[in-house]
Amino acid sequence: MLRKIGYFVIMCAALFLLAPSAHAGPPFLSDDPEPVPYQRTENDFFTSATHTKDGTAGTVMGLDANYGVWPDVELTLIAPLAFNAPDGSNAFFGYGDTQFAIKYRFLDESDDGWWPQIAIYPTVSVPTGKASHGLGAGNTQEFFPVWVQKDFDPWQTFGGGGYWNNPGAGHQNYWFFGWVLQRKITEELALGGEIFHQTASLEGEKDTGGFNLGGTYDLDENYHILFTAGRGIQNTSDTNTFSYYLALQLTY
Protein backbone atom coordinates (compact mmCIF):
# COMPACT_ATOMS: atom_id res chain seq x y z
CA MET A 1 0.00 0.00 0.00
CA LEU A 2 2.77 2.44 0.95
CA ARG A 3 4.58 1.59 -2.28
CA LYS A 4 1.45 2.40 -4.28
CA ILE A 5 1.09 5.73 -2.47
CA GLY A 6 4.74 6.50 -3.20
CA TYR A 7 4.26 5.74 -6.89
CA PHE A 8 1.20 8.01 -6.95
CA VAL A 9 3.13 10.94 -5.42
CA ILE A 10 6.00 10.46 -7.90
CA MET A 11 3.58 10.34 -10.84
CA CYS A 12 1.86 13.53 -9.65
CA ALA A 13 5.22 15.28 -9.34
CA ALA A 14 6.20 14.17 -12.83
CA LEU A 15 2.93 15.50 -14.24
CA PHE A 16 3.49 18.91 -12.65
CA LEU A 17 7.15 19.19 -13.60
CA LEU A 18 7.08 17.88 -17.17
CA ALA A 19 3.83 19.27 -18.51
CA PRO A 20 3.99 22.34 -20.81
CA SER A 21 2.31 28.84 -17.52
CA ALA A 22 1.65 32.17 -15.97
CA HIS A 23 -0.46 33.51 -12.94
CA ALA A 24 -0.91 35.58 -8.10
CA GLY A 25 -1.07 34.05 -4.67
CA PRO A 26 2.50 33.28 -3.63
CA PRO A 27 4.52 35.03 -2.30
CA PHE A 28 1.63 36.11 -0.05
CA LEU A 29 -0.23 33.92 2.47
CA SER A 30 -3.53 34.92 0.87
CA ASP A 31 -4.21 33.16 -2.41
CA ASP A 32 -6.07 34.24 -5.52
CA PRO A 33 -8.84 32.58 -7.56
CA GLU A 34 -6.98 32.56 -10.87
CA PRO A 35 -5.99 29.01 -11.93
CA VAL A 36 -2.97 28.16 -14.03
CA PRO A 37 -4.04 28.17 -17.72
CA TYR A 38 -5.13 24.88 -19.24
CA GLN A 39 -2.25 22.44 -19.92
CA ARG A 40 0.32 24.85 -18.48
CA THR A 41 2.53 24.61 -15.42
CA GLU A 42 3.73 26.91 -12.64
CA ASN A 43 6.48 25.65 -10.33
CA ASP A 44 7.71 27.67 -7.33
CA PHE A 45 10.99 26.57 -5.74
CA PHE A 46 10.78 28.37 -2.41
CA THR A 47 12.25 28.91 1.03
CA SER A 48 10.40 30.46 3.97
CA ALA A 49 10.65 30.89 7.73
CA THR A 50 8.96 32.46 10.76
CA HIS A 51 10.84 33.59 13.88
CA THR A 52 9.28 33.87 17.36
CA LYS A 53 10.64 34.28 20.87
CA ASP A 54 10.91 30.47 21.06
CA GLY A 55 12.90 29.91 17.86
CA THR A 56 12.64 29.70 14.08
CA ALA A 57 10.80 27.23 11.86
CA GLY A 58 9.99 26.98 8.18
CA THR A 59 10.99 25.41 4.88
CA VAL A 60 14.63 25.09 3.80
CA MET A 61 13.55 24.32 0.25
CA GLY A 62 10.14 23.41 -1.10
CA LEU A 63 8.29 22.78 -4.34
CA ASP A 64 4.89 24.38 -4.97
CA ALA A 65 3.79 22.80 -8.27
CA ASN A 66 0.61 23.80 -10.11
CA TYR A 67 -0.89 22.40 -13.31
CA GLY A 68 -3.92 23.51 -15.35
CA VAL A 69 -5.63 20.16 -15.75
CA TRP A 70 -8.83 21.64 -17.27
CA PRO A 71 -10.01 25.16 -18.11
CA ASP A 72 -10.64 26.92 -14.77
CA VAL A 73 -9.28 23.92 -12.81
CA GLU A 74 -5.81 23.68 -11.26
CA LEU A 75 -4.11 20.85 -9.37
CA THR A 76 -1.50 21.70 -6.71
CA LEU A 77 1.23 19.71 -4.97
CA ILE A 78 3.39 21.24 -2.20
CA ALA A 79 6.40 19.23 -1.04
CA PRO A 80 8.62 20.88 1.63
CA LEU A 81 11.98 20.11 3.22
CA ALA A 82 11.19 21.55 6.66
CA PHE A 83 13.22 22.70 9.65
CA ASN A 84 12.52 23.54 13.28
CA ALA A 85 15.18 25.32 15.36
CA PRO A 86 13.99 25.95 18.95
CA ASP A 87 16.11 28.39 20.95
CA GLY A 88 18.43 26.55 23.33
CA SER A 89 17.82 23.15 21.73
CA ASN A 90 18.88 21.04 18.76
CA ALA A 91 17.56 21.93 15.32
CA PHE A 92 15.60 19.37 13.32
CA PHE A 93 15.53 18.96 9.54
CA GLY A 94 13.41 16.61 7.44
CA TYR A 95 10.57 16.21 5.00
CA GLY A 96 7.45 18.09 6.11
CA ASP A 97 3.73 17.60 5.51
CA THR A 98 2.63 17.19 1.87
CA GLN A 99 -0.28 19.24 0.53
CA PHE A 100 -2.63 18.35 -2.32
CA ALA A 101 -5.21 20.86 -3.57
CA ILE A 102 -7.61 21.56 -6.39
CA LYS A 103 -8.66 25.06 -7.41
CA TYR A 104 -11.93 25.61 -9.27
CA ARG A 105 -12.84 29.06 -10.57
CA PHE A 106 -16.62 29.09 -10.87
CA LEU A 107 -17.07 32.79 -11.64
CA ASP A 108 -15.08 34.92 -14.09
CA GLU A 109 -14.35 38.61 -13.61
CA SER A 110 -16.42 41.11 -15.60
CA ASP A 111 -14.20 43.35 -17.72
CA ASP A 112 -16.54 46.35 -17.69
CA GLY A 113 -18.08 46.07 -14.23
CA TRP A 114 -17.26 45.54 -10.57
CA TRP A 115 -17.94 41.77 -10.44
CA PRO A 116 -14.81 39.81 -9.35
CA GLN A 117 -13.59 36.33 -10.17
CA ILE A 118 -14.19 33.76 -7.42
CA ALA A 119 -12.80 30.27 -6.78
CA ILE A 120 -12.79 27.52 -4.18
CA TYR A 121 -9.48 25.83 -3.36
CA PRO A 122 -9.95 22.80 -1.03
CA THR A 123 -6.65 21.51 0.33
CA VAL A 124 -5.59 18.32 2.12
CA SER A 125 -2.38 18.30 4.18
CA VAL A 126 -1.03 14.76 4.63
CA PRO A 127 1.04 14.15 7.81
CA THR A 128 4.30 13.06 6.17
CA GLY A 129 6.45 15.21 8.50
CA LYS A 130 7.68 14.06 11.92
CA ALA A 131 5.42 15.83 14.40
CA SER A 132 7.62 15.01 17.41
CA HIS A 133 10.38 17.13 15.83
CA GLY A 134 8.03 19.98 14.92
CA LEU A 135 8.20 19.14 11.20
CA GLY A 136 4.52 18.33 10.74
CA ALA A 137 1.06 18.44 12.29
CA GLY A 138 0.82 14.73 13.04
CA ASN A 139 -2.69 14.44 11.60
CA THR A 140 -4.41 14.95 8.26
CA GLN A 141 -5.72 18.52 7.95
CA GLU A 142 -8.20 20.02 5.48
CA PHE A 143 -8.60 23.65 4.41
CA PHE A 144 -11.77 24.98 2.75
CA PRO A 145 -11.17 28.53 1.46
CA VAL A 146 -12.90 30.88 -0.96
CA TRP A 147 -10.71 33.37 -2.88
CA VAL A 148 -11.78 36.54 -4.69
CA GLN A 149 -9.90 38.85 -7.10
CA LYS A 150 -10.55 42.07 -9.01
CA ASP A 151 -8.19 43.87 -11.38
CA PHE A 152 -8.13 47.63 -11.90
CA ASP A 153 -5.09 47.96 -14.14
CA PRO A 154 -2.40 48.69 -12.94
CA TRP A 155 -3.88 47.72 -9.56
CA GLN A 156 -4.88 44.23 -8.46
CA THR A 157 -6.59 43.14 -5.24
CA PHE A 158 -7.33 39.62 -4.02
CA GLY A 159 -7.90 37.59 -0.90
CA GLY A 160 -10.49 35.77 1.17
CA GLY A 161 -10.19 33.01 3.69
CA GLY A 162 -11.47 29.73 4.98
CA TYR A 163 -11.73 27.09 7.67
CA TRP A 164 -9.04 24.60 8.72
CA ASN A 165 -10.09 21.20 10.09
CA ASN A 166 -7.26 20.44 12.53
CA PRO A 167 -7.78 17.15 14.44
CA GLY A 168 -5.54 15.72 17.14
CA ALA A 169 -4.84 15.96 20.85
CA GLY A 170 -4.40 19.59 21.89
CA HIS A 171 -5.37 20.82 18.42
CA GLN A 172 -8.40 22.89 17.48
CA ASN A 173 -10.01 23.94 14.22
CA TYR A 174 -9.26 27.49 13.12
CA TRP A 175 -9.90 30.24 10.57
CA PHE A 176 -7.58 32.14 8.24
CA PHE A 177 -8.39 35.44 6.49
CA GLY A 178 -6.15 37.64 4.37
CA TRP A 179 -6.20 40.36 1.73
CA VAL A 180 -3.63 41.76 -0.73
CA LEU A 181 -3.40 45.01 -2.69
CA GLN A 182 -0.63 45.26 -5.27
CA ARG A 183 0.35 47.50 -8.16
CA LYS A 184 2.34 46.95 -11.32
CA ILE A 185 5.26 49.39 -11.11
CA THR A 186 6.98 48.49 -14.38
CA GLU A 187 6.49 45.79 -17.01
CA GLU A 188 8.69 43.52 -14.88
CA LEU A 189 7.96 44.58 -11.29
CA ALA A 190 4.80 44.41 -9.15
CA LEU A 191 4.76 45.42 -5.46
CA GLY A 192 2.08 44.99 -2.83
CA GLY A 193 1.07 44.56 0.77
CA GLU A 194 -0.99 42.04 2.69
CA ILE A 195 -2.85 41.94 6.00
CA PHE A 196 -3.96 38.64 7.54
CA HIS A 197 -5.51 37.10 10.64
CA GLN A 198 -5.53 33.51 11.91
CA THR A 199 -7.29 32.14 14.97
CA ALA A 200 -5.42 29.80 17.32
CA SER A 201 -4.73 26.28 16.00
CA LEU A 202 -3.69 24.78 19.37
CA GLU A 203 -5.39 24.81 22.75
CA GLY A 204 -3.92 27.59 24.87
CA GLU A 205 -2.29 29.20 21.82
CA LYS A 206 -2.98 32.82 20.87
CA ASP A 207 -4.50 34.21 17.68
CA THR A 208 -2.12 35.80 15.22
CA GLY A 209 -2.43 38.69 12.80
CA GLY A 210 0.14 40.54 10.75
CA PHE A 211 1.28 42.00 7.46
CA ASN A 212 3.61 41.20 4.58
CA LEU A 213 5.23 43.47 1.99
CA GLY A 214 6.64 42.11 -1.24
CA GLY A 215 6.04 41.41 -4.88
CA THR A 216 7.20 39.74 -8.05
CA TYR A 217 9.91 40.48 -10.60
CA ASP A 218 9.86 38.93 -14.08
CA LEU A 219 13.35 37.96 -15.22
CA ASP A 220 11.86 36.90 -18.56
CA GLU A 221 8.77 35.12 -19.88
CA ASN A 222 9.49 31.91 -17.96
CA TYR A 223 11.52 32.88 -14.87
CA HIS A 224 10.22 35.06 -12.02
CA ILE A 225 11.37 36.07 -8.53
CA LEU A 226 8.75 36.11 -5.73
CA PHE A 227 9.48 37.73 -2.38
CA THR A 228 7.83 38.94 0.84
CA ALA A 229 8.85 39.90 4.36
CA GLY A 230 6.64 40.75 7.29
CA ARG A 231 5.79 40.34 10.94
CA GLY A 232 2.91 39.96 13.33
CA ILE A 233 0.93 42.83 14.81
CA GLN A 234 -1.02 40.66 17.27
CA ASN A 235 0.69 38.53 19.95
CA THR A 236 3.85 39.23 17.99
CA SER A 237 6.52 37.67 20.21
CA ASP A 238 4.58 34.40 20.46
CA THR A 239 3.55 34.09 16.83
CA ASN A 240 5.68 36.10 14.37
CA THR A 241 8.46 38.56 15.12
CA PHE A 242 9.74 38.23 11.53
CA SER A 243 8.88 36.07 8.54
CA TYR A 244 9.95 35.83 4.91
CA TYR A 245 9.24 34.00 1.66
CA LEU A 246 11.55 33.81 -1.38
CA ALA A 247 10.98 31.77 -4.52
CA LEU A 248 12.14 31.19 -8.07
CA GLN A 249 9.08 30.59 -10.22
CA LEU A 250 9.18 28.73 -13.53
CA THR A 251 6.18 29.06 -15.87
CA TYR A 252 5.79 27.16 -19.11
Predicted regions and their residues:
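Active-site microenvironments that recognize anionic phosphate/pyrophosphate groups
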Residues: 20
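Bacterial N-terminal signal peptides
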Residues: 8-17
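Bacterial N-terminal signal peptides that target proteins for export
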Residues: 1-9
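Transmembrane beta-barrel domains of Gram-negative outer membranes and organellar outer membranes
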Residues: 23-252
